[in-house]
Structures are given as C-alpha cells and as structure tokens.
C-alpha cells in the first residue's frame, strides 16, 4: 500500500495543516484585520479538531511582533490550544 501513497496528487491533511501554519507566520509590518484573524482561527481549529478533541472556549490566538537579530520587524502567530483528548 505504501507504493500508492506517493501516487496521490492530493496533499495529506497533515501537509495542508503544516502549509497553513507556515502561511500564518507573518513577515509583515502591518496589522492583521480582526476578521482575517478570526478566519485563521476557525480554519486552524477545524483542522486540529479532526485529530484532537480541544477546548474551543479556552483557545487563545494572538500575533506577537518583535525585532530579529538583523533589526527586521517580524510577526508570529501564537496559539494556545488546550487539548481534551487525542482521537484514535
């Protein structure tokens, strides 16, 4: 069955989630609009909840801005997602 795994042109859910999280790591000096941040939150929670039961009411997502060693402004999306249990 491992042979057929490489023939699929569709990305795995794991790869989709990884790609989405990469996109969220923002290298932008501008602010993220509230509605965009909410869309990101819903999409991340949708993907994660397929594999893990989470406490949706206690999820915290924020954007932290800092300066890197070269003096560039960087932004990072920080997510705190409490886990109830892992789906098997």
Curated annotation (Swiss-Prot):
GO terms for biological process: cell division; regulation of division septum assembly. Keywords: Cell cycle, Cell division. InterPro entries: MinE, MinE_sf. Prevents the cell division inhibition by proteins MinC and MinD at internal division sites while permitting inhibition at polar sites. This ensures cell division at the proper site by restricting the formation of a division septum at the midpoint of the long axis of the cell. Belongs to the MinE family. This is Cell division topological specificity factor.
